[in-house]
Amino acid sequence: MNHPDWQLLAEKAALYLYPRRCPFCGAVLGRDAVQGTVCPACFEAADKRLVHLPPRLPETEHAFYALNSAVAAYYYSGEVRHAILACKRGGELWRARELADRMAVLIWGAMPSQTPGRRPAALAPVGMPRYHYIVPVPPREPLPGTAGMPLLLARRLGILIQTPVLAPLYSTKPLQPQKELTRAERLANKKDAYACRPGTDLSGKRVLLVDDIITTGATVSACALALQQAGAYEITAAAVAATEELPKSLQKSTEKRK
């Protein structure tokens, strides 16, 4: 006998009290929402101009190690940058759910809902699961009393692709803010900066490592190394956005909007 999906039913009921909003501008989604999750204006501004195609990140732009692959839904620019900062620093935590829904559609090909605010339908993997666990990157400075953005993204993705979430990673040393550091300094700052809690056993597991932004790749790589040391044999890093130079075609379209 099929049991009802109580979480899905609760989401549908919550739509009447707390309407879903566009992850980029915050507007309440109407019947004209594109793919059920983005207002038409932001679809033109973000999804048509800032989507990272293909999602896989080139190693020439990053300094990856200990990872099998890395993917992102968007380039870190414009409306996407605004949405991430509003979530991380502005306390608008609801944006993490909406951005995770976009990740599911753009990275893993989930079927977008045709009804505004409804969750996208993940395509069930055939045979063995795509990932055994989803693991969030531990945030350096989460807002007081809140989960960090990577954990919020991981929880939503766990629902969408039906994969359990683990949070075994922790920082082993004080970390400097990465923003002002050079590429070499970022790598040194993150070297041996993470470990898995004692007793964590990921032997033979495929792990999806989730962060909000991938810049040099220093953070996700250092986390991946810790997961490897706990036994993980295949690790994919995924983020809402990646910091890379925009392709020339996107640079031109972005300049036209200014």
Region spans (language model):
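Glycine-rich phosphate/pyrophosphate-handling loop used in enzymes and phosphotransfer proteins
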Residues: 1-211, 215-258
